[in-house]
């Protein structure tokens, strides 16, 4: 037991000595490396040679896309690699020290910034330590929350694909001093976003020349390509708009006597206005392009507005004053003949079979109307009225071709009726008979006027029904064409529906 304890104590002591020696080597190495080191000096063996810096990034997350302010917010880890000529050592002279770390400001590092930064601090990176190995290879990985300006093209919203550029480059060094080289971006640690799908992040190296200097100024641009996920906007904007536009078609199915046709149209129009305001709050105030969903809302509002106008015309037809005149001939031909035939509409009661008259040649013959002498019958005024018709057997009216009056009712013309009423010479028999016949003539004229007014009203009401049915078909077709034509015009409509709504 004593021997084993002694061996364990010796091993522990050896480990402590080794750690103390390694700490001594690190301290010595830091002192030697920073002895004559100047962080302002470009670390190259020959000042005429450029220092090559390899640059790339790791996209961790798309945090926000502000369409209104056109700002992209991302979580990115930058990666910069270069070789520092003054930070090299022999590993054998410093056992166990394979790499060292220098905080920001102690050694030289490239001043690479995001050119199109929209952050208030401009440089949004967290300055971490620089990792250096024995060969002088430096590795600098600063993370940061980057806010970059990005032109948001809302032409195909919400079926849009946005491309935002992240342009990086040295702020003070030109191409002759710092050779910036690009490496492929890393998306292995990317965290998916609920609103956007990352399509890719390709990079490109370009060189720019300015009038002040002959040397080139290299920069690296990574393009964040992302596709909007449309499920949210489809359920909250598109589908309600489609349903509201379908409700607008119900205006033509609502009876004119209900008194709610105009109210329904105005309500639908106000609902679409509310959705338009929601879209306007999301979209940037730009006149470069009109969003796809705004085009669809605008077309739907035009349809609803026209439906309200047509509804006013339909109500004017339905409640047309018969004293205002008969329907014009061209209106009757177009609406009651052509459109009614095309829509397979028939006037109410047109299919009913009218009873045939027993006397076609003598429709108004009064030969069968004979009032014999009535004895013992007292009138309401207390007097006995003896009425007799003589010589009326041969009186009849001219046949008429008017089919608007039901058979069985006297359809004589006013002249024929006048001759009929005076042919029996009622005044020679009894003056009360003349008064009665005058009242009968008034009642007949009144019925005739009512029939004519009713026929005119029915004609206008049928015309209103034809306009309603015609507009229902026309607006339905136009709504379907606008819905399919506008929404499917987006380049990635099929892809968005298959991925987001599947």
From Swiss-Prot:
Signal peptide: 1-23
CDD domains hit by this protein: LGIC_ECD_nAChR_A7, LGIC_TM_cation
Pfam families cross-referenced by the UniProt entry: Neur_chan_LBD, Neur_chan_memb
GO BP annotations listed: calcium ion transport; chemical synaptic transmission; cognition; intracellular calcium ion homeostasis; monoatomic ion transmembrane transport; negative regulation of cytokine production involved in inflammatory response; negative regulation of tumor necrosis factor production; positive regulation of angiogenesis
Molecular function GO terms recorded: acetylcholine binding; acetylcholine receptor activity; acetylcholine-gated monoatomic cation-selective channel activity; amyloid-beta binding; chloride channel regulator activity; protein homodimerization activity; toxic substance binding
Cytoplasmic side: 316-469
Keywords: Calcium, Cell membrane, Disulfide bond, Glycoprotein, Ion channel, Ion transport, Ligand-gated ion channel, Membrane, Metal-binding, Postsynaptic cell membrane, Receptor, Signal, Synapse, Transmembrane, Transmembrane helix, Transport
Glycosylation sites: 46, 90, 133
Residue ranges crossing the lipid bilayer per the database entry: 234-254, 262-282, 295-315, 470-490
Reactions listed under catalytic activity: Ca(2+)(in) = Ca(2+)(out); K(+)(in) = K(+)(out); Na(+)(in) = Na(+)(out); choline(out) = choline(in)
Subunit structure: Homopentamer. Can also form heteropentamers with CHRNB2, mainly found in basal forebrain cholinergic neurons.
PANTHER family, per database record: NEUROTRANSMITTER GATED ION CHANNEL
Protein name: Neuronal acetylcholine receptor subunit alpha-7
